[in-house]
């Protein structure tokens, strides 16, 4: 019976697929064994990617309704690229919202209503000839991803309709195809019933954004296959069961031959059978199979050969498989008999230029970056990914939570409050078919990937009977995997939906409370460590739970990549834009930028902490040797080389490499083989220990460091006193105090109340005098907990102070000048800054904060520092500090004490909104030099200090919402701090920095540093 399209389907919850073919596995198939072994692009597929003709309408009423008719000429239309988003190719505009629906405030709607006047329509046309090898064969079309709903016509005839943006939609074109030119028409709507189910935290696009291709099938064809590669209870026998659904042009006998090859190409098992049915199951077993895990992703290759009744080979299907067993044992998730810990990250499919159109190269870069930084798991937040992603996870080794395309966040949570009065799907069983369709489509496509350990019922959609039934479906069709859903946290009546306790952004204490109160399920954080801007502070508090509580089984950082889009400012310069930058309203602004890599895929400084805390092998050195703790479940350390290095005051003394063997789940203490000489000098020693790859791997080259540990110790006392010799001349002017030595002069101003000149060899170093600084440019997390509101008085105190006293003391060998400052915020806050000038031209600076009386009434300090400016020519930095990447009090676990160089402009991290960045803790020395290697050196004296050196002041950064708003660079701004508060990261909407990383206003603070000329 012929079906006619109807635009009313867009708002009909009962219509989500018309004439769409049943979902099936994502296997490939070939005509010969030789092809199947090489797996080239399939000859029975023909890509329709590329330029299509295109028309854009702002709503259905203005679309060209009859464009699909053969007599309607579309060849003069514009071109658009497929795959691609409409909004990134010059039509409409991208919009970013998090939880609210994109029409909020413009239309008052309830499901399944959609806006009538704001529903952009993209009309696509592709003219094609059927490839010769597909002529006289069945012809099908596959759309791998179309957002959010679309209609298809071929040669004027209606073909079908589909919703669900993130799983394939396939249709039979055979009845409509003709010889010669065919006219394929696709009408894509941005809003549909499906829009209510796709309220994920991402940019709202529309269009054909994944591959489109034609395909044909042979006379005997594996339409669907379900490969179950399991293990028996002893884990010693692999049980391979493959269920096939066949398509046959004639109901004649089929011979199926199955051959299983190991990774070296040897046949390890075979089976064959004959069948007259459309369903068949082929079984075989393997003794002592190599097992699949993220540590060692061993894949076998199954070849299925289909012969017709004459014995002619018709089709060959290659399929990679991994033997593994994933299950709950005594309320603990185990893989191949071992307790697993997910060291994971959430990943949106994203490219800063093309949005959710990602290439294989993008995927490879992501997976290699993850592996290099010890990430072992990924959650496909919050929709099924491009099919190729799972193949790469199988091959490279990543554990996957595969999440169905469901999020209805705006239907139950408003402004952070749980209010589910009109939540969908909830218990509204009329929504079950459209929701279940998404679950079925994901399962059927992805079911054969060993990397997928867990099915997820979606994200942030509250809970109810519908989602519970989705969970029951997954369990009924696939007992080899577990089921995840976090939303039951808000509705415990549906707790059975999830096999694990899953929470978002729970504090470490809350997690411990769960784990110490008779837990019934293992715990994972499906989202934690909200990595928005300068964040990820305190991550160690979560990873420390891994060995403390067996039922704590890890978590997934939010998230992998900044969802920021390249845009040009008014002068044509590119920058990464966020919500609102395209005139999109409503919007959630920069909340889209939460990545541990930037939108250009370069790792952010936060990745330094991730790599260290996610190490599977821990190196714990002391002065005599190193404890190697191999926390891998299945692999020993034979693939790595141990390297250890001894440094004295940052200078390398000794280095050695050796092989090391530590079995999985074991630890070994290895003594160092040091040379005796050079180890008794007074000073600071640092031992670095590293494990590096012996050979190239798929994901990294030989020499890549997989694990690191360090030990710092001191020999002898710290040299605090200066013994510089020479004469100093002191000039007491009416306004200034001048101190002069050989080839240098220092000037202190009574009027300014500070050091105003430091003149070395005819060059002025001070462009702006040092002043107390209490403020840092607010980070995204600071903004989330209203730091400017609560602690804004320190912003004011940093801009205005009063020098109430100046004292000068002349002694043999040095001259001291002490300034005392008061602040309008409180008459009980006092800061003293003392400068001691020595005959060699060096200065010792001591800064003291006192507020012991009355300080308890003041808010916490963002930092306690001195800030001054040098000329911008001093832009070369040489550090001996914790690094090499930026680090903070609560994000320094992964930093190492080392020497490194960078430029001032590079110290500013590339967060999409300017904010505090570039800090280094544990600073011993930092040289600030010009191109000739001249300048100053800032050195700690009693305790290591913190330094942040930037082209901009905290206040310039504070006032800018985008990098292009920052002024031209005129100075090098030096902030030397005794302490700065941590950056936090439990969440970005109110979670405070943990207490031990906060600067309380009622504590006395002091730091000391030297300024030396270079």
Swiss-Prot record:
Superkingdom per UniProt: Bacteria
Catalytic activity: Hydrolysis of terminal non-reducing beta-D-galactose residues in beta-D-galactosides
Gene Ontology terms for molecular function: beta-galactosidase activity; carbohydrate binding
Entry EC number(s): 3.2.1.23
Coiled-coil residues: none
GO term, biological process aspect, one: lactose catabolic process
InterPro entries registered for this protein in UniProt: B-gal_small/dom_5, Bact_Beta-galactosidase, Beta-gal/glucu_dom_sf, Gal_mutarotase_sf_dom, Galactose-bd-like_sf, GH-type_carb-bd, Glyco_hydro_2, Glyco_hydro_2_AS
Active site: residue positions: 460 (proton donor), 527 (nucleophile)
Keywords: Glycosidase, Hydrolase
SMART domains listed in its UniProt record: Bgal_small_N
GO cellular component annotations of the record: beta-galactosidase complex
SUPFAM superfamilies documented for this protein: (Trans)glycosidases, beta-Galactosidase/glucuronidase domain, Galactose mutarotase-like, Galactose-binding domain-like
Hydrolase found in the keyword field: yes
Family: Belongs to the glycosyl hydrolase 2 family.
UniProt name for this protein: Beta-galactosidase
Taxonomic lineage: Bacteria, Bacillati, Bacillota, Bacilli, Bacillales
């Amino acid at each position: 019976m012929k079906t006619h399209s109807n635009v009313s389907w867009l708002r009909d919850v009962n219509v989500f697929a018309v004439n769409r073919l049943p979902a099936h596995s994502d296997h490939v198939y070939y005509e010969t064994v030789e092809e199947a072994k090489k797996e080239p692009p399939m000859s029975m597929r023909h890509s329709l990617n590329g330029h299509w003709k295109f028309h854009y309408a702002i709503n259905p009423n203005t679309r060209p309704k009859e464009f699909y008719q053969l007599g309607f000429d579309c060849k003069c239309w514009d071109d658009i690229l497929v795959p691609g988003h409409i909004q990134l190719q010059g039509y409409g505009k991208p919009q970013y919202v998090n939880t609210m629906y994109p029409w909020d405030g413009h239309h008052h709607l309830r499901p399944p209503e959609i806006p009538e006047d704001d529903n952009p329509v993209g009309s696509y046309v592709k003219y094609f000839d059927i490839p010769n090898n597909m002529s006289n064969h069945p012809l099908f079309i596959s759309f791998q991803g179309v957002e959010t709903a679309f209609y298809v016509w071929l040669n004027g005839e209606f073909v079908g309709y589909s919703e669900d943006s993130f799983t394939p939609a396939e249709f039979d074109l055979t009845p409509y195809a003709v010889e010669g030119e065919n006219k394929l028409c696709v009408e894509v709507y941005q809003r549909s019933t499906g829009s209510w189910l796709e309220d994920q935290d991402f940019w709202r696009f529309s269009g054909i954004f994944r591959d489109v291709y034609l395909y044909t099938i042979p006379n005997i064809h594996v339409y669907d296959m379900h490969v179950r590669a399991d293990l028996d209870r002893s884990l010693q026998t692999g049980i391979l069961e493959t269920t096939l659904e066949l398509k046959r042009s004639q109901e004649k006998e089929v011979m199926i031959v199955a051959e299983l090859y190991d990774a070296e190409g040897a046949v390890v098992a075979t089976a064959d059978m004959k069948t007259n049915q459309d369903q068949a199951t082929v079984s075989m077993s393997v003794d002592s199979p190599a097992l699949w895990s993220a540590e060692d992703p061993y894949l076998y290759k199954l070849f299925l050969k289909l012969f017709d009744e004459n014995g002619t080979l018709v089709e060959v299907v290659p399929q990679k498989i991994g033997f593994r067993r994933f299950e709950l044992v005594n309320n603990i998730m185990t893989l191949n008999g071992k307790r697993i810990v997910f060291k994971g990250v959430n990943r949106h499919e994203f490219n800063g230029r093309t949005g959710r159109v990602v290439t294989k190269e993008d995927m490879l870069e992501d997976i290699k970056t993850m592996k290099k930084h010890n990430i072992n798991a990924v959650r496909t937040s919050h929709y099924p990914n491009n099919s190729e992603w799972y193949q790469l996870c199988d091959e490279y080794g990543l554990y996957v939570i595969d999440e169905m395309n469901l999020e209805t966040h705006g239907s139950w949570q408003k402004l952070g409050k749980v209010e589910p009065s009109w939540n969908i799907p909830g218990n509204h069983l009329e929504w079950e078919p459209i929701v279940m369709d998404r679950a079925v489509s994901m399962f059927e496509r992805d079911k054969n990937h060993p990397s997928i350990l867990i099915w997820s019922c979606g994200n942030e959609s509250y809970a109810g009977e519908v989602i519970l039934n989705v969970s029951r479906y997954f369990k009924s069709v696939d007992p080899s995997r577990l089921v995840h859903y976090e939303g039951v946290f808000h509705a415990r009546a549906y707790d059975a939906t999830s096999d694990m306790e899953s929470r978002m952004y729970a504090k470490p204490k809350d997690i411990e409370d769960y784990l110490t109160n008779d837990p019934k399920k293992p715990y994972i954080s499906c989202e934690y460590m909200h990595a928005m801007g300068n964040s990820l502070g305190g991550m160690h508090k979560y990873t420390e739970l891994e060995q403390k509580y067996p039922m704590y089984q890890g978590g997934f950082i939010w998230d992998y990549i900044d969802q920021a889009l390249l845009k040009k400012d008014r002068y044509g310069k590119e920058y990464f834009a966020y919500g609102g930058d395209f005139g999109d309203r409503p919007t959630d602004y920069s909340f889209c930028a939460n990545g541990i890599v930037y939108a250009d895929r370069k790792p952010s400084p936060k990745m330094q902490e991730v790599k260290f805390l996610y190490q599977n092998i821990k190196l714990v050195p002391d002065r005599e040797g190193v404890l190697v703790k191999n926390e891998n479940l299945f692999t020993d350390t034979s693939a790595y080389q141990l390297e250890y290095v001894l440094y004295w005051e940052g200078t390398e003394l000794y280095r050695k490499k050796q092989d090391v063997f530590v079995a999985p789940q074991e630890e070994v203490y290895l003594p160092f083989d040091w040379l005796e000489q050079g180890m008794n000098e007074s000073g600071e020693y640092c031992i670095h220990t590293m494990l590096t790859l012996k050979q190239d791997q798929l994901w990294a080259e030989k020499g890549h460091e997989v694990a690191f540990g360090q030990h710092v110790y001191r020999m002898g006392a710290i040299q605090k006193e200066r013994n510089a010799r020479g004469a100093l001349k002191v000039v007491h002017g009416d306004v200034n105090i001048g101190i002069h030595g050989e080839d240098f002069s220092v000037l202190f101003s009574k009027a300014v109340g500070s050091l105003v000149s430091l003149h070395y060899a005819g060059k002025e170093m001070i462009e702006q005098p040092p002043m107390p600084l209490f403020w840092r440019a607010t980070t995204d997390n600071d903004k989330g907990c209203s730091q400017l509101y609560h602690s804004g008085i320190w912003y004011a105190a940093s801009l205005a102070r009063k020098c109430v006293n100046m004292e000068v003391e002349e002694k043999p060998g040095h001259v001291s000048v002490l300034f005392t400052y008061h602040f309008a915020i409180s008459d009980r806050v006092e800061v003293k800054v003392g400068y001691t000038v020595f005959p060699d031209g060096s200065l010792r600076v001591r800064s003291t904060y006192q507020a012991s009386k009355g300080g308890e009434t003041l808010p916490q300090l963002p930092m306690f520092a001195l800030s001054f400016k040098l000329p911008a020519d001093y832009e070369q930095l040489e550090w001996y500090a914790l690094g090499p990447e930026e680090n903070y009090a609560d994000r320094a676990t992964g930093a190492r004490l080392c020497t490194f160089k960078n430029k001032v402009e590079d110290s500013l991290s590339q967060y999409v909104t300017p904010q505090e960045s570039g800090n280094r803790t544990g600073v011993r020395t930092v040289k600030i030099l010009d191109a000739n290697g001249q300048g100053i050196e800032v050195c700690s004296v009693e305790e290591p200090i913190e330094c942040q050196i930037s082209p901009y002041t905290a206040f310039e950064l504070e006032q800018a919402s985008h990098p292009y708003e920052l002024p031209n660079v005129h100075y090098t701004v030096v902030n030397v701090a005794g302490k700065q508060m941590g950056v936090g990261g439990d969440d970005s909407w109110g979670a405070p920095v943990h207490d031990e990383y906060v600067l309380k206003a009622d504590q006395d603070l002091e730091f000391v540093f030297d300024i030396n000329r270079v």
